[in-house]
Amino acid sequence: MPIITLPNGDQKSFDHPVSVMEVAQSIGPGLAKNTVAGRVNDRLVDACDLITEDSTLQIITPKDEEGLEIIRHSCAHLVGHAVKQLFPEAKMVIGPVIEEGFYYDIWMPRPFTLDDMAAIEERMKKLIDQDYDVIKKMTPRDEVIKVFTDRGEEYKLRLVEDMPEEKAMGLYYHQEYVDMCRGPHVPNTKFLKSFKLTKISGAYWRGDAKNEQLQRIYGTAWADKKQLAAYIKRIEEAEKRDHRKIGKALDLFHMQEEAPGMVFWHANGWTIYQVLEQYMRKVQQDNGYQEIKTPQIVDFTLWEKSGHAANYAENMFTTHSESRNYAVKPMNCPCHVQVFNQGLKSYRDLPIRLAEFGSCHRNEPSGSLHGIMRVRGFTQDDAHIFCTKEQIGKEVADFIKLTLDVYKDFGFEEVQMKLSTRPEKRVGDDALWDLAEKSLADALDAAGLEWELQPGEGAFYGPKIEFSLKDCLGRVWQCGTIQCDFNLPVRLDASYVTEENERDQPVMLHRAILGSFERFIGILIEHYAGFMPPWLSPVQACVMNITDSQAEASEQVVAKLKENGLRAISDLRNEKIGFKIRERTLERIPYLLVLGDREVEEGTVNVRTRSGKNLGTMSVDAFIDLVKSAVAERGRYIVE
């Protein structure tokens, strides 16, 4: 007779096998009404599943993270139910949960339209209103094959073939529709009311472009209407902040078909890029890095020796000349080892920190390209530290401090850090892994911030720390990384002379702070919605005259601002001053300076911000000091 132990320690005894739902009902009708599933002995199960022995049980409701994930998974099945009713010719493939939502891959003889998506969503709502129970049946393998054969679901049959060890499988019935899944799923469609379909895109069977093309319907689902509304509002705000739209509106960059995944930087965007590069150059110089420059195109034999050819060839652009094969570098590390290898190195020379604003190219699939966030040609703030095993800890600690300071300068205060440790398949002895992992963990602890352990998620050649930023919409962007490498120095014959006058391989620390400049600028654009802090604004001030009589004085003010290092322009058009102010405000220029007869006579400027705040009249020198003070605060300064 099972004794059920609840999370608060209470126990309930039953004289027969009991389902999760029955336990919930024995506790109270309110809990039973909200029961989505259960966690029995730390394993998620359906509400209908029986408990036959003494067990621990947590009732899962929509308020739990697992409950929300189950709701989303069940919504994917509901998509299948609606699609098969509306489009019987469709073939269902897979429908997993993703962050904040779900999708379903479907084969159709024709593309889905937006009208189709609206019809599918409407049918889903009607099915939910029927308030039907979702029925789970553990089904023998042969019967599963028969079910999907009778229904002509060839992709489901392929998935069954992928699981030869499974003797029985879970089939979930939504009325006449049936889907295969490990579960768990909601017991009733009443839990699925707070959902929305969001978009349609293309996909490939098994994610391989050589296979048949599928269509992917995305959606989101939440515990209640309030959460759904908040999500929709956040998505609408994200769409307003789309870096592609803002990039066009502010004349920052463009992309075009003749160069897919390559950025055409316009003057305004290139100014932001240069500010980033100049800032990072000084930061790295101040922290003991030597800046180098390595070739764009390198003989393919180096990539074979480094191991990249075996593991990365399909993402590399290659070329051929004079009977030699070359690759356009997808990353900088092998070239940095070549620089390190020039000349004999002693332990006294270490650590050596080599930095490069390295231009890299990767042959990313065209379907994955996204504005300047996912490109084929990009520049990294890349650096490699060559050090002894004993120096790992200090180098990592210094890098963590440097990285967090840089992020604060760009206005990012919330940073998530994750330590990934040794996988099963790896190079290097355990003692070296022990030392490296402890060095990284100690450095994280010394920073005094929370961090997350990801066991087994490190690369085969060493543990790593990842740094992720949280933007104003709560989205998380992985940017920085520091990665121990015990492999590449061995493969590329990097060595130094130890204190005992012997040869040893240095540890190589791969590190980046911003990552790709292109992607980081995209993040900045969306984080600030184009309203860059003054230090990053392509134009920091626009000087405008009221009438032609102030034109010369306006140009003189612009000249003085430029002499003092400000990025300034004039607007001398024969337009009303209100029109010029509105237009320049739309360009997100932080400061708008107006000159009338009084300002010319007094040698002053009237200053207002892009948000409309009037800062009053001040001397040009006072305004210069104001901007320089704002620039010095970098991302910590907000233009009111």
Curated annotation (Swiss-Prot):
- UniProt keyword terms in alphabetical order: Aminoacyl-tRNA synthetase, ATP-binding, Cytoplasm, Ligase, Metal-binding, Nucleotide-binding, Protein biosynthesis, RNA-binding, tRNA-binding, Zinc
The UniProt annotation places Zn(2+) binding at C333, H384, H510
Entry keyword Plastid: no
List the Pfam families.
HGTP_anticodon, TGS, tRNA-synt_2b, tRNA_SAD
Q: What is its EC number?
A: 6.1.1.3
Q: What cofactor does its activity depend on?
A: Zn(2+)
Q: Which GO terms describe its molecular function?
A: ATP binding; metal ion binding; threonine-tRNA ligase activity; tRNA binding
One GO term of the biological process aspect: threonyl-tRNA aminoacylation
Q: How is the cofactor bound?
A: Binds 1 zinc ion per subunit.
Where is the protein localized? Cytoplasm
InterPro entries associated with the record: aa-tRNA-synt_IIb (IPR002314), aa-tRNA-synth_II (IPR006195), aa-tRNA-synth_II/BPL/LPL (IPR045864), Anticodon-bd (IPR004154), Anticodon-bd_dom_sf (IPR036621), Beta-grasp_dom_sf (IPR012675), TGS (IPR004095), TGS-like (IPR012676)
Entry-linked PROSITE patterns = AA_TRNA_LIGASE_II, TGS
Query: Which segments constitute the TGS domain?
Result: 1-61
One cellular component GO annotation, for this chain's record? cytosol
Give the EC class as a word: ligase
- Gene3D superfamilies hit by this protein: 3.10.20.30, 3.30.54.20, Anticodon-binding domain, Bira Bifunctional Protein, Domain 2, Threonyl-trna Synthetase, Chain A, domain 2
Q: Which reaction does it catalyse?
A: tRNA(Thr) + L-threonine + ATP = L-threonyl-tRNA(Thr) + AMP + diphosphate + H(+)
UniProt cross-references to NCBIfam families, sorted A to Z: thrS (TIGR00418)
Protein name, UniProt field: Threonine--tRNA ligase
The organism is: Acinetobacter baumannii (strain ATCC 17978 / DSM 105126 / CIP 53.77 / LMG 1025 / NCDC KC755 / 5377)
